[in-house]
Regions:
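Hydrophobic alpha-helical membrane segments
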Residues: 1-330
Length: 330
């Protein structure tokens, strides 16, 4: 299998999926669980926010603090659960790509690899966080030394001249103007972040597959081996991503639907119901659209990526697929 031949990868992926008896059942379970977890987390977060709004006074401070903490932890718990589920789903797609039997039970593998997956995710987060910080430190001096910052200087100079002993005081209108004037700096920082993060992203692209394929591997080893595997092939992986444009375009449409309650008023379209109803309405449509995209498209995409991984990994002695879990996880 040649990663440079995207058509060959896709055709082989279609053949593997056609022979996978449990392929549609796997994506059905994965999609339903993902959507159910997202829906429950959103509803619980809304209920918590309503309860927080009802608590007031010193007597309710403890309850309010507990509810606020629960609301803050909820997205973290959701992200960790979906992270494990995602890895388990990828393991089933890797089995299908290799012509091996796979079933929904295989999605438990992500939870079996929880600690190494968590460490790997945290390490990648630190790496990308460092990239973001570096891009910001580069973008701000560029912004300040170019005419892009003139509007900020025009806003700040009168404030500095009139500053008293208490320092510079900003009213809401001035603060809004300052944020608008800083927008070029944010755009410049974002562009630099993308330019710096893209090579890093493709460098560690195969780390999750290595965690699946090698039960004894650690987080650092997975990142290191991924870097070695993708060396010289990052452009080919990028080309493969571009060939999947239809999937990513569909996901962007679903995200736009999720923010429909905010986008439509910005376009001058007034919605005939309250903000809360509009939020949950568009969120429900977003979940439905996401389910359709996952159910009909996700398997094709992930089996193709699994084949790309197999085309890059060094040839090793066969072990009958034991690296993907025991018989009860297949």
């Amino acid at each position: 299998m040649d990663i440079r031949n995207t058509r060959q990868l896709k055709d082989f992926s279609a053949g593997r999926l056609a022979n996978a008896r449990e392929g549609q059942k796997i994506i059905l379970y994965f999609s339903l669980i993902t959507i159910a977890v997202s829906a429950v987390a959103t509803v619980v977060s809304y209920i918590l926010s309503q309860q927080i709004a009802k608590t007031g006074g010193l007597g309710s401070m403890g309850v309010r603090s507990a509810l606020t903490t629960a609301q803050m932890l909820l997205p973290i718990v959701q992200a960790v659960f979906l992270m494990c589920l995602e890895l388990g789903y990828l393991s089933t797609m890797l089995r299908i790509a290799r012509g091996q039997y796979a079933s929904p039970n295989g999605m438990r593998l992500g939870f079996d690899r929880f600690w190494v997956l968590l460490r790997c995710t945290l390490l990648k987060g630190l790496i990308f966080g460092g990239v973001a910080m570096a891009s910001m430190y580069v973008a701000i001096p560029i912004y300040m030394m170019t005419p892009l910052s003139n509007s900020v200087v025009d806003i700040l100079m009168p404030l500095v001249k009139n500053a008293g002993t208490s320092g510079i005081l900003l009213d809401d209108a001035t603060y809004a103007q300052l944020m608008d004037a800083m927008m070029p700096a944010a755009v410049l920082s974002g562009v630099l972040s993308l330019a710096l993060a893209a090579p890093v992203f493709y460098r560690y692209r195969m780390a999750d597959y290595l965690i699946i394929d090698r039960p004894a591997t650690g987080a650092l080893a997975a990142l290191r081996d991924s870097r070695v595997m993708t060396k010289g092939n990052r452009w080919n992986l990028f080309r493969l991503d571009l060939s999947m444009w239809w999937y990513y375009a569909a996901m962007l449409v679903s995200i736009a639907v999720n923010y429909g309650d905010q986008l439509l008023p910005d376009l001058g379209i007034t919605l005939p119901f309250s903000d809360t109803v509009a939020y949950f309405l568009f969120f429900g449509v977003y979940l439905a659209v996401t389910f359709v995209i996952f159910y009909f498209l996700r398997n094709r995409v992930e089996v193709t990526y699994a084949l790309a991984y197999d085309s890059l990994r060094p040839r090793e002695p066969e072990n009958n697929g034991a690296v993907l879990g025991n018989i009860f996880q297949m």
